[in-house]
Amino acid sequence: MPRLSRRQLLKTAAISTALSTVPAPLLAASREKLVVPPLIEVRRGRPIVLTMQETNYPLDGSHNVTVWGFNGNYLGPTIKIKSGSFAKLNYHNNLPQSVALSIQGLQASGELFGGAARVLKKGESWAPIVPIEQPAASCWYRSATLANSAYQTYRGLAGMWLIEDEQSLKANLPNKYGVDDIPLILQDMEFNNDGLQLFKQNQPHFVGNRLLVNGIEAPYLDVARGWIRLRLLNASLARAYDLRLDNDQEMLLIAQDLGFLPKAKSVKSLVLSPGERAEILVNMMKLTTYLSLAEVNVACTKNKKYVVLRR
């Protein structure tokens, strides 16, 4: 496949497709539907309210347990903001621990977007105003608390932060959030018999044995006919993922951590290290049943399929 310039990418793309034979109704019956994080689209100075708090959620699929997150949900909402505007943040910490937050990939000074030096104790709030002055990119926010960031991120203090610019807004790319423009937050975890998250504080490279997408293990998602855009985030602590489509179909890699690639790349697999982001396009036009985003080499995991895309 010829390499595409960014200008060509914003106009058109082409990927070969393949078919799978498992009936979609049977497949979906054994899986939960993907939860798409709520969207906060910032317009005309709308404040971004992020309240860190405990909530109840069945992470293991059966036990309703206490987890952490934002605004009453496990994980945080997706923030979408245009370059050239200001992010009016309102952080509130209702958790039993002190928390510092950071926005990874955001090009702004640390005193404005947080970091380990800006700690919020239980009950405290903070309302910085952050100028957004960079090209379109998929960033993410997470805990940056000194000596405790891994644990707090693992508990659920993470979410996606999407920056758009004039070019990305005019692009001929999927942009209907939750329909054909879908965030996928990848995590690995361990649970006890009661469904509570296990975290091995003294293990330098913690790797769980359960794989979750947006807080659900191996979910399915009904998607639109045609092209879909997947915004991938590896929110795991130590696990790197080698991702592919299980029918060996090609994906079009269009963006990574700091924005669009100079030229799009047709790939059959994609490696994501912890904290890395990537955007891929998948052609669902000819697909009659489903395909799965899976990991090529998964060790010590219960289920290698991350999310089933069903049309």
Curated annotation (Swiss-Prot):
Signal sequence extent: 1-29
Free-text description of this protein's post-translational modifications in UniProt: Predicted to be exported by the Tat system. The position of the signal peptide cleavage has not been experimentally proven.
One Pfam family from the record: Cu-oxidase_3
SUPFAM superfamilies: Cupredoxins (SSF49503)
Domain Plastocyanin-like intervals: 228-297
Gene Ontology terms: cellular component: periplasmic space
Top-level division of the source organism's lineage: Bacteria
Subcellular location as annotated: Periplasm
UniProt keyword Disulfide bond, yes or no: no
Alphabetically ordered keywords of this record: Cell cycle, Cell division, Periplasm, Signal
Single Gene Ontology BP annotation: cell division
GO MF annotations, alphabetized: copper ion binding
Function: Cell division protein that is required for growth during stress conditions. May be involved in protecting or stabilizing the divisomal assembly under conditions of stress.
Family under the similarity heading: Belongs to the FtsP family.
UniProt-recorded name of the protein: Putative cell division protein FtsP
Species: Haemophilus influenzae (strain ATCC 51907 / DSM 11121 / KW20 / Rd)
